[in-house]
Amino acid sequence: MTLAEFQADIRAGIPEILPELRPYDHSVSHAPKRKDILTPEEKKLALRNALRYFPKKYHATLAPEFAEELRTYGRIYMYRFRPQYDMYARPIEDYPHKSLQAAGIMLMIQNNLDPAVAQHPHELITYGGNGAVFQNWAQYRLVMKYLSEMTDEQTLVMYSGHPLGLFPSHKNAPRVVVTNGMVIPNYSKPDDWERDNALGVSQYGQMTAGSYMYIGPQGIGHGTTITVLNAARKQMGSNKSQDGIKGMLFVSSGLGGMSGAQPKAGNIAGVVSVVAEINPHAAEKRHAQGWVDELHSDLDELIPAIRKAVAEKRTVSMAYVGNVVDLWERLAAEEIHVDLGSDQTSLHNPWAGGYYPVGMTLEESNDMMAADPDQFRERVQESLRRQVTAINKLTSKGMYFFDYGNAFLLQSQRAGADIVGSDGKFRYPSYVQDIMGPMFFDYGFGPFRWVCTSGAPKDLETTDRIAAEVMEKIRQEAPEEIVGQMDDNIHWIKEAGRNRLVVGSQARILYADAEGRAKIAAAFNDAIKKGEISKPVVLGRDHHDVSGTDSPFRETSNIYDGSQFCADMAIQNVIGDSFRGATWVSIHNGGGVGWGEVINGGFGMLIDGSEDSARHIREMLFWDVNNGIARRSWARNEGSMHAIEREMQRTPGFKVTMPNLVEDDLINNLFN
């Protein structure tokens, strides 16, 4: 397809002439069939909802086709309307546009749906089993058409994948405002998502899937690396040297969109990592992309390979293509010493493809979850109980186990596993409680990211160099409390190119605090203005950040004043970003830990070398981080109190309400 044909297809939106119905493509990974949850009347409603995208003259053709999709897959994806062109992030000038900001958003959307990047690309699922960009291909086509037409005086409003329309606004307003899964709280159970999504009225956007900000496994790679690195240091009782990390064994599960970062992170940290993945498609994709070194499908071969690698203190990553419970039970039976353990199965979505029970094949599980969901639920919970039993045996021998924010502890507790101690608390910490919260989030460090819209590796190399120079300059005057974090982050960005992290767009992830993000972004803007970077850069972050997410079992699990179940921070954050210069903003229900368990939001900002971009950087990035530090400070988190005091000294006009600490004895004596 020529560039002109591609641009014409984008501008056309939903085509005037129905495209040919193509055969089901078995070359890519597909979402499992969803449970049959709709009543007969609701199925009729789902069809009416789907057909309203199309002229009446096509209803007789499309109605039986969509009804068959609903019967076969549990959803209406509108496969007929999947574009003929290849899906990937093109250079920004390839997109037909009147607004350069809108062209940047088109690039980001296509990256989220790139088969090299997305988990189930034909079902518009980017990661996590159900993290959707859109609900169907009609929505995709309409959105791309609107983006190609809009000006910088309009805003596109997105309701859970559905483009409500272009509304008049102004150049400093966001070009797109996204909401995903915003349901009334009393109707936010997992089955409510199943029903609403099958009806075509809501979707689960995960975090960066529905907000057009996913950058492949690299997006979680830096966070996973510093988590593994600092978990290893906790085991060693030292944070001064990496020598003792060599030969440590790290065991986990998942090679999907987020979990797929684990083996690469293990390599960067210098450990032996073993990650189980039941889906051969996912394991082979990560191996082909260089994110895992070895594939093993036989435990009798894997166990000796693990022993040998540990004895030789090699840095190597191994994937076990099989069920994680089989792996944990075998490690426990063989009494292999595991240093670090975690889990990244998609337990935010345990009954619909996020967790596969032991003793069943992938295909058997996919069939049962749709045909007999109650029995499947029992098998999942039995499997979780067995997994926890094996993990408990290994932790009794010295393994440090941490929950990686995927609802493992929560779902294990609900399954009746031996996961709660005598004090009523979980046996194991969340990684945010032990590592990410007190060491990073409380000081404002989080997953800042950028995408070079030229698509040129040379531009990415330039941004890496600029970011390293900025960080090194900040490091010279950094307070002692954050020197270790700065050193790890500088090392990451200097090694990023060599570690071959790019999958999809020319993107980079870098943990940085408010000062670092603003100064790096300002330096990028200057470099674009001077022509050192050839095209605009999109700035963003994961929602998994200092201010973006209220999640009591992950991002805010180290909030102990009782407000961990409140979502004021995430809501205030997206509102504040929207009028301080974000190009697009999003707010979601459920990213990471699951539907009804989380509120999370994010942003994207296209910078083009202009003074407007410089102002947006100054105003928005400051708020986007310090909102969360202020909230964490009010919760009496020591690191945040230090960080916010420092920020108030640095920034005129910034004044935060500080907590007054109370003596424990004073309170305790009143209740004796």
Predicted features along the sequence, with ranges:
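Solvent-exposed alpha-helices and their adjacent loops that cap or buttress functional pockets
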Residues: 149-151, 167-172, 186-187, 239-245, ...
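Catalytic or ion-translocation cores adjacent to nucleophile or general acid/base/metal-coordination motifs
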Residues: 205-229, 233, 239-240, 246-249, ...
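Short, solvent-exposed amphipathic alpha-helical segments in soluble enzyme
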Residues: 267-269, 332-336, 417-421, 528-529, ...
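Residue-level detector of anion-binding/catalytic polar loops
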Residues: 272, 337, 400
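Glycine-rich beta-alpha junction loops
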Residues: 280, 322-325, 344-349, 405-411, ...
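Small-residue-enriched alpha-helical segments and adjacent helix-cap loops
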Residues: 537, 541-572
